Amino acid sequence: AGASWLTHDFQVWTAEGARRLEVALQPVPVPEVSIEGPGLPVQPLAGWLAGAGRVTVVDFMYTRCETICLSLGGVFQQMQRRLQQEPMAPGAAVRLLSISFDGSYDTPARLAAYARQLGADPALWQFSRVPQASESAALLRRLQVVVVPDGRGDYEHNAALLVLDAQGRLVRVFDVSEQELALNYARHLAATGRT
């Protein structure tokens, strides 16, 4: 009985698999946290998500990262290109948001430089941070993003593509290698409003 409970009736075998299944079955609302970034004054994340009525694909990163964050940036560059090449109807748009979990270092100016380096189009892809450390921790905890300082000024962290709806709820989690699936799901959700 314990194995059945731990694996959601033998549907998943990892903690990440369990997270994905749990989110798909029960969307997770973002906590009350504020974000800021280049062109984004301090504002509630939930309000920003709801403001444009669009579906948002989110990743978590930090600008000093020289490993997985660069891969995530490359994935978002490809997703941005696809969004530019295949625009959707107004009101059914998808956008991208990179959130730094290193808010004390990643100031809006540093995020702006990083965005320029990646060729981010601010109409489609924005960068932000959660300026309050306690709020950042609450957001990471709620969305089950694991970030561990490595003792050398860097971080070990999991990486995924998180799809959030216009109500500010995490509705799906995709592996970084599933970028096409994540974007197609986000577009479907934007067009139909159904998870």
Residue ranges and their predicted role:
Residues 30-31, 55-56, 158-160:
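Short loop/turn microsegments at loop-to-beta-strand junctions
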Residues 45-76:
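Short active-site neighborhood of thiol/selenol oxidoreductases, capturing the structured segment around
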Residues 43-46, 171-172:
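Generic structural signal for well-ordered beta-strand positions
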Residues 123-125, 137, 141-150, 154-162:
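Structural micro-motif
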Residues 1-36, 192-195:
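N-terminal targeting signals for export/organelle localization
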Residues 37-39, 164-165:
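Short, acidic, Ser/Thr-enriched surface-loop or helix-capping motifs
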Residues 150-195:
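Thiol-/selenol-based redox modules, centered on thioredoxin-like
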Residues 72-139:
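Structural microenvironment flanking redox-active thiols in thiol-disulfide oxidoreductases
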